[in-house]
Amino acid sequence: MTSKIFKFFLTWWLTQQVTGLAVPFMLDMAPNAFDDQYESCVEDMEKKAPQLLQEDFNMNEELKLEWEKAEINWKEIKNSTSYPAGFHDFHGTALVAYTGNLAIDFNRAVRDFKKSPDNFHYKAFHYYLTRAVQLLNDQGCSLVYRGTKVMFEYTGKGSVRFGQFSSSSLTKRVALSSNFFSNHGTLFIIRTCLGVNIKEFSSFPREEEVLIPGYEVYHKVTAQNDNGYNEIFLDSPERKKSNFNCFYNGSAQTVNIDFSISGSRESCVSLFLVVLLGLLVQQLTLAEL
């Protein structure tokens, strides 16, 4: 009986550690991210991207399936959707696909690009989504809200960026809903000038989604915990030069790129706890046989 009680509390404690309640994510400049803005190579990329898309399809079955579904949805809504000159079907399909089931895996790949650049199978998708956001941007700024189920912290020094495409909402209520937020997470209150309203393209228009590109940098960061949960205010946004530019165009420009793996200490701790949990529970189970 004693061993069962011990096993229960041990499992509970380790689970809390593994789920991230004790290991928050640090908000920084996302140094591993793929942040290409395709400056001065849009015309060339428009020619090359269809080929890259087919190559990605061959390596990424989920992307292929989600793209095909998004193509159908885009054809159904394009005639009732307003979009600027230069915005074509590939851009529309990319936006629709992003609001479906691709966002989590895609953003993980974008955020950790430098750790495994050869395994990045979203080359064309990243281009089309980036261009869609750039074309839709009306040069205006908005106050938006982004809820997360994981805790973020800020060191108090330096500018920050998300390093991935980040969904937000014009409505605080949406960001605080259980679909996006938990009390162990973070509410971001963001002044964005590069984010664009994609309500017309979204699979969930009631969310009033504003999509923020990962290269928007925030120079003023304020964190507080006055409402019983973590809040981070991001202000003074700016579009700064990216680490990558025209990377898949054959005339790549990079800024101080180091492709060595820069894994975080927090990831190592989480992995260790997962392994420890499994081993200890296994030993306790065997001891009761």
From Swiss-Prot:
Pfam hit, one: ART
Signal peptide annotation: 1-20
Molecular function via GO: hydrolase activity, acting on glycosyl bonds; NAD+ nucleosidase activity; NAD+-protein-arginine ADP-ribosyltransferase activity; nucleotidyltransferase activity
Chain residues in the propeptide: 261-289
Record-level GO BP terms: NAD catabolic process
Tissue distribution of the protein: Expressed in spleen, intestine and thymus.
Keyword Ribosomal protein part of the UniProt annotation: no
Disulphides: 41-246, 141-193
EC number(s) from the headed UniProt entry: 2.4.2.31, 3.2.2.5
Glycosylated residues, chain numbering: 79, 249
Function text: Has both NAD(+) glycohydrolase and ADP-ribosyltransferase activity.
Name listed for the protein in its UniProt record: T-cell ecto-ADP-ribosyltransferase 2
Gene name of the record: Art2b
